[in-house]
Amino acid sequence: MKFLDQAKIFVKSGDGGAGCCSFRREKHIEFGGPDGGDGGRGGDVILECVANLNTLIDYRYQQHFKAKIGNHGQGRNKTGGKGDDVILKVPVGTQVLDEEKETVLADLTSAGQTMVLLRGGDGGFGNMHYKSSTNQAPRRADEGWPGEERWIWLRLKMIADAGLVGLPNAGKSTFLAAVTRARPKIADYPFTTLHPNLGVVTLGEEEFVIADIPGLIEGAHEGAGIGDRFLGHIERCRVLLHLIDGTQDDVAEAYRVVRHELAAYGGGLDEKPEVVALNKCDSLTADDIELKLMELSEACGQEVLPLSGVSGVGLKPILARLFTHIREAREAEPAVPAASPIFGSSKRGAPTFQQRKRKLQAEDDEFAGGHWGADGEWIWHSADNDGDEVDEDYDDEDLEEVADDEEDDAEE
């Protein structure tokens, strides 16, 4: 399966169904009155996090997703059915960003987590809502409210406990294959790994996930090589395993290059706990191993462990140290409260069902001087002094202007 870790898509929730204008027609009932039902709500756009996906490739060839419109109302006070939802299935670790990639709208980190991204539009009122003592046969019915729409970015950040970093050909994929059942591509040339790979390490009765990303080179944060695009996949890691190729002449410089790229990327990668290992020790003499371990320890300021992914030397001590950091990080993490299952981009021009109902009642009020209705930030005026219907929404500034005008009229 091809790997894709980001995709731009267009989503639209369904429009509300139209209200119905109808009248009761039955034998021996001369004046049945209105019985038009309301339209149904439009379908929602829902994100669902599933465990059996590890790529966003499904969104490469289809970028537009639209929920269904709500069903129209019918006679006999029948409310239209809700439109079908659009359910977008994404891998664990998917983030939702706005079109400019500046704001994270949602972060799905556990399988089974769902989130309503866009709500469907409300259905229109049927003529039953307009019945009053003075208008017993209204012929007015509303269209449904439009749904919401927007462009969004989906960005995948894999969920792993430990992340492998290092220069190309440092032996990261070989190490992953040696400690897990993952089978990444392994070859003797740079950038063999072109996308992240995950593997599960079993250590006694404990398990943790380790991620292998493409190698970094000097200037990766400026786009050199594959760049630092895949560093986002280790942002969630609790510890980093930094592998250094022991066959290089200057192992200290190799360490500093990668550390510089981690710091330049940001995201707190350079502040994460780190385990440093000198890899490919099977190709070195005992004196060379001792000398390079000393040079590397001075550069990183901590003990460096010898390792050979091919022969298996040093694997258990490294895994034990990684799990020690992982266990400490797990214990230190605060309990995360359950995320709200509902997320939506609110529309300022779309009042709630109760607000709309109050507005309709205000419009039918027979008060000669007009009637003001207020609910939170919504303020409506139903009729002007001539009794003509006015359908306007006012905010706080508009209300202050109206009050000032009334004071001026009173002074005159």
Curated annotation (Swiss-Prot):
- Occurrences of domain Obg (ranges): 1-159
Q: Which EC number(s) are documented for this chain?
A: 3.6.5.-
Q: Source species, please? A: Paramagnetospirillum magneticum (strain ATCC 700264 / AMB-1)
Q: Which PANTHER family match?
A: DEVELOPMENTALLY REGULATED GTP-BINDING PROTEIN-RELATED, MITOCHONDRIAL RIBOSOME-ASSOCIATED GTPASE 2
Q: SUPFAM superfamilies, from UniProt?
A: Obg GTP-binding protein N-terminal domain (SSF82051), P-loop containing nucleoside triphosphate hydrolases (SSF52540)
Q: Name one GO molecular function term.
A: magnesium ion binding
Gene Ontology annotations of biological process type: ribosome biogenesis
| Subunit-structure text | Monomer.
Q: Where in the cell is it found?
A: Cytoplasm
Q: What is this protein called?
A: GTPase Obg
Gene from which this protein is expressed: obg
Binding annotation for GTP: 166-173, 191-195, 212-215, 279-282, 308-310
Location of the OBG-type G domain: 160-327
- Record's function text: An essential GTPase which binds GTP, GDP and possibly (p)ppGpp with moderate affinity, with high nucleotide exchange rates and a fairly low GTP hydrolysis rate. Plays a role in control of the cell cycle, stress response, ribosome biogenesis and in those bacteria that undergo differentiation, in morphogenesis control.
| Keyword Ribonucleoprotein attached | no
- In residue numbers, the region (Disordered) covers 335-412
Q: Which amino acids does the record list as binding Mg(2+)?
A: 173, 193
Q: Which InterPro entries match?
A: G_OBG, GTP-bd, GTP-bd_Obg/CgtA, GTP1-OBG_CS, GTP1_OBG_dom, GTP1_OBG_dom_sf, OBG_GTPase, P-loop_NTPase
